[in-house]
Amino acid sequence: MLLPLYGLASFLVLSQAALVNTSAPQASNDDPFNHSPSFYPTPQGGRINDGKWQAAFYRARELVDQMSIAEKVNLTTGVGSASGPCSGNTGSVPRLNISSICVQDGPLSVRAADLTDVFPCGMAASSSFNKQLIYDRAVAIGSEFKGKGADAILGPVYGPMGVKAAGGRGWEGHGPDPYLEGVIAYLQTIGIQSQGVVSTAKHLIGNEQEHFRFAKKDKHAGKIDPGMFNTSSSLSSEIDDRAMHEIYLWPFAEAVRGGVSSIMCSYNKLNGSHACQNSYLLNYLLKEELGFQGFVMTDWGALYSGIDAANAGLDMDMPCEAQYFGGNLTTAVLNGTLPQDRLDDMATRILSALIYSGVHNPDGPNYNAQTFLTEGHEYFKQQEGDIVVLNKHVDVRSDINRAVALRSAVEGVVLLKNEHETLPLGREKVKRISILGQAAGDDSKGTSCSLRGCGSGAIGTGYGSGAGTFSYFVTPADGIGARAQQEKISYEFIGDSWNQAAAMDSALYADAAIEVANSVAGEEIGDVDGNYGDLNNLTLWHNAVPLIKNISSINNNTIVIVTSGQQIDLEPFIDNENVTAVIYSSYLGQDFGTVLAKVLFGDENPSGKLPFTIAKDVNDYIPVIEKVDVPDPVDKFTESIYVDYRYFDKYNKPVRYEFGYGLSYSNFSLSDIEIQTLQPFSENAEPAANYSETYQYKQSNMDPSEYTVPEGFKELANYTYPYIHDASSIKANSSYDYPEGYSTEQLDGPKSLAAGGLGGNHTCGMLVTLSLLKSQIKVLMLVGLHLNCMLDIQIMMNSQHLQCNYVDLKRCFWIKIILKLFLLN
């Protein structure tokens, strides 16, 4: 299917036959999902030929060589949930002036801190298809984390990718196309870390739904079918090698290529093995094949073992509530079950990531994520310690950041329908408007309910740890109403979507009836209008569809504004001839109502494009697994690479709106497109250079008595320490049951041609030239590739040359080149 010539971006779609990397660890061929093979040891960091990373490792190793075992463990270990000022806090090494590391939610704002901006979500940002704006947004977000004294942002999100329309957290990501999200991942990594903050790419990998991310026993009994959550383990996402490389791993590869310093592993299993202790995922795919040099941290409570996870490539346990690390990790090193050089590498990766990203916060965080109180006990959760200043109420907002947030929201608005040039509005077209719907007005619970799980009115974000704390929020009713006043247009707002008599009375005499509708998705944190993160269905909330039908039956100029995390069912009203215009957006942040007004009244020309496909039949979307009758739930990704537009293309399914669709208030034409291959593609990739020599760390003191709780030291409740309690209990363990394939022998060079550099091996190339008549063409490549060689694309625009690079796999057989072009307004 070809995309219609509406809009903003030009797409060059290059797809290929996928090939298995035969030198990688292989699972059985009996089942394409089967189980994860093992890969050991964890590749030692700092051995790849990258000057900036090597310099960071050089400095970090100097520090680690001076540390005791307990000091190293302290860096790898969270101190417990809510046991510090940030979302997550590690221990410190005061002797070497190394402070506790502060890691903080979330992707779009400094969650649980005051006086910050709440930016549009990732899905809204990706709708802009504007690389400069995406970079600027990342810089702005990074600057606010820096201003609050956080060391690392727990974001952005590249998993879930949003392959499931009803998935709860798809809005935190950037859509199911791997190239689009990959471009964004690269830009956001550079932007955030330019501010001296660690970027944490999450969630690795296959975390495409919220149901069953944890093992649960009747958690919601009495509210919904208890069997829905009656499981003994978390969901296993079973993904084949081609889909892993061409879809799900791709954005993480681009983040690594951009120098990302931290990656968070996910709650779910991958092919039968928990993601945070999956040696094939962490040791091979991430640290060997992609050459990741930073550190891997767990999602909160995603760890199910200590020694196995550390040997599998995990570097930091957050928040370490179950204490798999802490004193247990110290014990594992002392009794010989965890090699000391693995602990050395864990600590070094953490420190080198901070150095690489330019983190320098000598005063620490100036806020406390547990409370907005100005003063209180230093250990607020335990209510212990001295009375100290908890929140300095530092205002990190700026005119520049607000402008970026506003611009990102404007360019995230997608115009889906505009019959008879209904929009933009103006006094010459309308004298009276009605603003209708519960989703247009204030939420009766405000904007600060727990983890933003409000959902009873207008919304600026989804809910969960990926939300933000609003300093202000403009509802559609306020924004559109204020703009109508400027135009001297009479308006009325009716917020009751259930008793519709007042709304219909208002609409009957209006020149335009504007119905605002939404659905709210988020993290599985509890009941939000009967939804537990993932959406129960793709129907608009708050009785919106009956209201639209009733209003449009009496007003032939009905305008519908839809806000949702991802796709939503538009079929009940989209073909209604009295519904003359439809606007869509994902969650737009603090300026939601202001942005809608700007677009409705023509102050801004809508330029957003859909970062996913909207189906005609909701049954064509990949479903969320909602109920299981087995204790160990499995999600087989049988669609493989055929997600979103790939699926609709392959199976010739009808769609309502294509990936990349979006109208504007202008008309354009395109002519004389020419594609030339100037250089044949070579399938012979050159291997990357061998790794530098393995670093030999100084051995720490192995006397258990050195690591007991210091005499007179008072331990806080619910706080994790690196100490052991009984030195006499430490005995050498020569019978530990290591996994199959376990080894401590480091490789001299890349395991396969796919490995050897940041984001993969970049050694072979192809040149394609596009000659375009129009000077204002934006080109975006969407390439279904494995991760290895270099592909150079040169774009000629009126004699101006723009070159960009991308990676591919050895033996990349190109089977088709499809040019899909859109004009930039």
From Swiss-Prot:
Keyword Methyltransferase: no
Signal peptide residue numbers: 1-20
Reactions catalysed, as given in the entry: Hydrolysis of terminal, non-reducing beta-D-glucosyl residues with release of beta-D-glucose
Key words, A-Z: Carbohydrate metabolism, Cellulose degradation, Glycoprotein, Glycosidase, Hydrolase, Polysaccharide degradation, Signal
Catalytic machinery residues: D299
Key word Signal present: yes
Major enzyme class: hydrolase
EC identifiers of the protein: 3.2.1.21
InterPro entries registered for this protein in UniProt: Cellulose_deg_GH3 (IPR050288), Glyco_hydro_3_AS (IPR019800), Glyco_hydro_3_C (IPR002772), Glyco_hydro_3_C_sf (IPR036881), Glyco_hydro_3_N (IPR001764), Glyco_hydro_3_N_sf (IPR036962), Glycoside_hydrolase_SF (IPR017853)
GO MF annotation terms: beta-glucosidase activity
Glycan attachment positions: 21, 74, 97, 230, 271, 328, 335, 537, 550, 556, 578, 667, 690, 718, 733, 761
Gene3D superfamilies: Glycoside hydrolase family 3 C-terminal domain, Glycoside hydrolase, family 3, N-terminal domain
Disulphide-bonded residues: none
Pathway stated in the Swiss-Prot or TrEMBL entry: Glycan metabolism; cellulose degradation
Any one GO biological process: cellulose catabolic process
Family in the record: Belongs to the glycosyl hydrolase 3 family.
Oligomeric form and interacting partners: Homotetramer.
Name of the protein in question: Beta-glucosidase
Annotated source species: Wickerhamomyces anomalus (Yeast)
